[in-house]
Amino acid sequence: MAGDEIKAALFLCALQNAVRHGGVPQAGAVIGMVMGAHPELRKQAKEVSAAAKDAIADVAALSPEERVTKLQSLSPEMFAALHEKHEKKKVLPDLEGAEHGVVMRFAPNPSGPLHIGHARAAALNDAYVKQYGGRYILRIEDTDPKRVDPEAYDMVKEDIAWMGLGITETVTQSERFPIYYDLCKQLIERGGAYVCTCENEHFKALKDAKKACPCRDQPVETALLLWEKMLNGGFKEGEASVRVKTDLLNPDPAMRDYPIFRILDAPLHPKIGDARVYPLMNFSVVADDHLLGVTHVIRGKDHIANTRRQRYIYDHFGWKVPVYRHYGRMGIEGVVLSTSQMHAGIDEGKYTGWDDIHLGTLRALARRGISPDAVKNAMIAIGIGDVDISFSWDNLYAENKKIVDPVANRYFFVPDPLEAKIAGASAHTAHAMLHPGHEEKGTRTLEFTGTVLIPRAEIFSVIVSSLNDISQGGDYESPQAKISSENVSPITSINEKKESVHSDNLPKLEGSLSSSLNDRKLVPRKYEPKREITMLRLKDLFNVNITWDGETPSFSYGGDSLADARAAKARIIQWLPAQSFVPCTLLTQDGEMKGACEPAVTTEVGKVVQFERIAFARIDAVTESGVRAYFTHT
């Protein structure tokens, strides 16, 4: 999108947001709406964010009456959408102590882009902040240099923008090391921590025996000197660490005097290359939750043990503990979620990038045409229960269908097409609706001049079904390269053309309809010559009779009457004029489907359309080979 188009889209979304909520539009919601409709703008996140501020300012300057009038005139569809009836959304359970507002946080590691697993915490926290009001903090937890990808900082923010989360502030932990160092000093002074110089194996043996190591009873002054020595480079990696004093009799060994600071010589942190003393997660999280005023923490129950560890630090400082809610584990199958596996796969060329549709990243979902609102709604529907579950892709697709079905334009896509001449048919013009629920969108025009492209599989299905009916249980025999005539021509190189092409340029190849069915035996040894087999309805055009003459199917005009087609229980199939189509490849997680689509599909790049009788698909690009589309769902 050009700059002016981005500004116009942002202004309309900001206008709709203001009219809907009766106030100043929220930047996160506006940006999320635009990026949800145009995921390709993720790469322009900074430009979009800057333009959003101007759009919001322009809308804020209008009176409520002016906003309504302007939205009605500029986008009647968006105004009408405000009054559409929606299903009642699932309500999340109340949070204890949230009556006066909340401060919540989403805290990912910058090891890669966000994936569907991150979306649960992100969406649940966002929903609660919107429900109760308050602040929503994005906290980049990058205190472990081994888990930092420099490119991930921007990717995480782009994914946050795509989701449309109402983030009010962003904090990066690597920028807060001086704060953590000062708090560690205070904790030592309070007698709540000490510097341990024991060898790891020796400390573990003592810990397992529920005994204190010699360092635990060191005077505060000694501990402070050792702490300064750590900061000044006086120890090598593994020679010293800071441990918090807990209960040595705790039945869980992992709770006994666990470390909160360690020394790492390598790798260097990309943002603070001179740092060698690193806070561990359980310390930096407590420090930030307290200093940032976090009131409620929603996270997975795999963090229950961390919650117990962190309470020791809260108690040492005398700080108020946030309200914790731990939800059950969510198993996700069918996609790759491991950042290390994704990294390796991209480096090896196994995946095309972070948005490869075999991955579980949010940007992969966006490329497939999944709406951010669908992701959020699916996660809110799952809720914060503590029972372990398996993530349902079908539920996500159902949520997405609610969003895309009312707006996606309809087109014909003919997979693995056959070119068929329709005997006895005069020229016809088909007028197919762009969307059955929006007459105002108008129609697509398809001109029939004698020859059409039809799906090969449909003809197989019809012929097999009909021959089964007339075979009387006889054996089947493959015609082996005999189903080829002036009426039926297999098209095997459809992707050689990138624009509308004519049938005169298509190869007339010898072949068999049965060849794509692994030599499936289609023709009965006993058949009735010139027997009418069945009727098909070419959608929005006319009826076609298929007859079987020996081993060759023939197609003839069967009239315009839709009533006749219904009476004959004719299958309604998609088609294309043989003289006007664009090659199209529909990519799925299992492979690809090559075929042809309407030329108008080339105007839908970046949008989700419905290929009638096939699936919803996001039009990704138009290349020299034709249209590239990604399967969304059925």
Swiss-Prot record:
Name assigned to this protein: Glutamate--tRNA ligase
UniProt keyword terms in alphabetical order: Aminoacyl-tRNA synthetase, ATP-binding, Cytoplasm, Ligase, Nucleotide-binding, Protein biosynthesis
Keyword Zinc appears in the UniProt entry: no
UniProt-listed Enzyme Commission number(s): 6.1.1.17
A single BP term in Gene Ontology: amide biosynthetic process
Native species: Methanoregula boonei (strain DSM 21154 / JCM 14090 / 6A8)
Main location: cytoplasm
SUPFAM superfamilies reported for this sequence: Nucleotidylyl transferase (SSF52374), Ribosomal protein L25-like (SSF50715)
Catalytic activity: tRNA(Glu) + L-glutamate + ATP = L-glutamyl-tRNA(Glu) + AMP + diphosphate
Segments carrying motif 'HIGH' region: 108-118
A Pfam family this chain is assigned to: tRNA-synt_1c_C
Stretches that traverse the bilayer: none
A GO CC term attached to the entry: protein-containing complex
